[in-house]
From Swiss-Prot:
Family stated for the protein in its record: Belongs to the transaldolase family. Type 3B subfamily.
Active site: K83
Protein role: Transaldolase is important for the balance of metabolites in the pentose-phosphate pathway.
Name the UniProt record assigns to this protein: Probable transaldolase
Enzyme class (EC, first level): transferase
HAMAP family xrefs: Transaldolase_3b
Cellular component per GO, a single term: cytoplasm
Alphabetical GO biological process terms: carbohydrate metabolic process; pentose-phosphate shunt
Annotated pathway: Carbohydrate degradation; pentose phosphate pathway; D-glyceraldehyde 3-phosphate and beta-D-fructose 6-phosphate from D-ribose 5-phosphate and D-xylulose 5-phosphate (non-oxidative stage): step 2/3
InterPro entries per record: Aldolase_TIM, TAL/FSA, Transaldolase_3B, Transaldolase_3B/F6P_aldolase, Transaldolase_AS, TSA/FSA_arc/bac
Organismal lineage: Archaea, Methanobacteriati, Methanobacteriota, Methanomada group, Methanococci
Keywords noted in UniProt: Cytoplasm, Pentose shunt, Schiff base, Transferase
Length: 215
């Protein structure tokens, strides 16, 4: 499974990229707003750091506006993927862009039907939001299992990005279900490193070594 970093924080991207853990990056207007920098400047810098896909989201709500923005975004770098919302206008834009060879990531997916529609429209990626479904009392990971089942049954090549990841269990369950990608906030990715028995083991090794050296 590929790991995308869900952030626009350039320093965090550099940190995890240096570990060989970043296969791509997803951003959205809210994440870029947190950085307090120019939208295009941030996307361009991220694309220069990461070799893999970098998702940048359009702001327009009409298909014509989305297509216009998308064509500008892909001029920034070869690895830009255009993020499009799951709406009728969005799917119209995806269909146009796919015919132009522009890769798209359809975001705000909350049902398998929506994922299927996006794939049929020509999306390169779909992003089901698991954490937000959990927030309203639904099982976010069940959606992933449904999407993987449908895509597998028909050999659909659109890749599934598990989004709105809130904790390490989301990542593990995504991997067990065979999801192509999990896009992970850096604080959640940090938690994947941790286990109390690892810490205890390191402490024991150091203690034993110090005791040995002090004999």
């Amino acid at each position: 499974m590929k790991f995308f970093l869900d952030t626009a924080n350039v320093e965090k991207i550099k940190e995890f990229n240096a570990l060989g853990l970043v296969d791509g990056v997803t951003t959205n207007p809210s994440l870029i707003k947190k950085e307090g920098r120019d939208f295009y400047e941030v996307i361009k810098e991220i694309c220069s750091i990461v070799d893999g896909p970098v998702s940048a989201e359009v702001i327009a709500l009409d298909s014509e506006g989305m297509v216009k923005e998308a064509r500008e975004l892909v001029k920034l770098a070869e690895n830009v993927v255009v993020k499009i919302p799951m709406t009728k206008e969005g799917m119209k834009a995806v269909n146009i862009l796919s015919k132009e060879g522009i890769k798209t990531n359809v975001t705000l997916i909350f049902s398998a039907n929506q994922a299927l529609l996006a794939a049929k429209a020509g999306a390169s990626y779909v992003s089901p939001f698991v954490g937000r479904l959990d927030d309203v009392g639904q099982d976010g990971m069940f959606l992933i299992s449904e999407v993987m089942q449908v895509f597998g049954a028909y050999g659909i090549e659109t890749e599934v990005i598990v989004a709105s990841v809130r904790h390490p269990i989301h990542v593990l369950e995504s991997a067990k279900m065979g999801a192509d990608i999990a896009t992970i906030p850096f604080d959640v990715l940090d938690k994947l490193f941790n286990h109390p028995l690892t810490d205890n083991g390191i402490a024991k090794f150091l203690s034993d070594w110090e005791a040995h050296m002090n004999r």
